[in-house]
Design a protein with these regions (language model features):
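Active-site mouth loops of central-metabolism enzymes
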Residues: 21-33, 93-108
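Short, well-ordered coil/turn segments that N-cap beta-strands
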Residues: 10-15, 46-48, 79-83, 120-124, ...
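Conserved, mostly hydrophobic/aromatic
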Residues: 17, 35, 50, 72, ...
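CE4/NodB-like, metal-dependent polysaccharide N-deacetylase domain
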Residues: 106-127, 150
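Structural motif corresponding to the early beta-alpha repeats
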Residues: 55-56, 78-102
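Beta/alpha (TIM)-barrel catalytic core signal, keyed to glycine-rich beta->alpha loops juxtaposed to Asp/Glu
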Residues: 131-229
Length: 229
């Protein structure tokens, strides 16, 4: 695959592999050996861009916690110099509720945990997972700038950012990429494109297949166990 460039200089494959579903949100965690093989196959196919997050956890049948970052870090360790690993901070899942904390203290604690679980000395792209209404974007951006100076991250991004939030953060520390929902079923963030072009910020789409709706796996005759499915 021919590389794309996010921001000023972050080269990635045009299609990235989102790893969330391996441990989180779609039932029990998948078999880790099978997922390791899948990740190795993805590298062999030309994928260089892999996405995870500190909050992508699940519960194994034995009751232990499956950490997505641990799975990704272990599987990609032999290819570390060939791949770009993106992870995220600032969100915790508390049952059906999200707790958002993007204070400098929380970000610093999170980055140390992610570095350890990923078995790496730096994170290529570190996202603020969600906007924290209690922390100004300038504060988050300044924290990210410090982490860059310390060599713990090399680029940073924001997930679910608005134009105003992006501009304020970018003025303090240039943002490499925005990761927002985008698909043929959800196109609200297309309004951001002119701003991204102006600021030279990349756009990374999540849920491009609308959580599977556009994957051709479902028909008008498909039936589910309950309405929540």
């Amino acid at each position: 695959m021919k590389d794309r460039v996010l921001g000023k200089d972050l080269k990635v494959s045009p299609v990235g592999l989102g790893c969330m579903g391996m441990t989180h949100a779609y039932g029990a965690p998948a078999d880790e050996k099978e997922m390791a093989k899948l990740l190795e196959k993805a590298v062999d196919m030309g994928y260089t861009f892999f996405d995870t997050a500190e909050c992508y956890t699940g519960v194994r049948p034995d009751g232990t916690t499956a950490y997505n970052e641990e799975l990704v870090g272990e599987a990609l360790k032999p290819f570390r110099d060939k791949v770009v690993i993106a992870t995220k901070c600032g969100v915790r899942h508390l049952g059906d509720r999200l707790e958002v904390d993007c204070s400098p203290q929380a970000i610093r604690k999170a980055v140390e945990g992610s570095l350890r679980r990923l078995q790496t000395d730096h994170i290529d792209l570190y996202y603020q997972h969600r906007v924290d209404p209690n922390v100004e974007p300038e504060v988050v951006a300044d924290t990210m700038a410090q982490l860059m100076k310390e060599g713990k991250i090399t680029h940073w991004g924001i997930s679910e950012a608005s134009e105003d939030y992006l501009r304020r953060a970018h003025a303090v520390c240039p943002v490499t990429a925005i990761q927002n929902r985008l698909s043929m079923m959800y196109r609200d963030y297309e309004a951001l494109f002119p701003t991204l072009e102006e600021l030279n910020v990349g756009f990374v789409a999540f849920s491009p297949l609308a959580n599977g709706l556009l994957s051709a796996c479902y028909r008008d005759t498909s039936q589910f166990e309950n309405s929540a499915a």
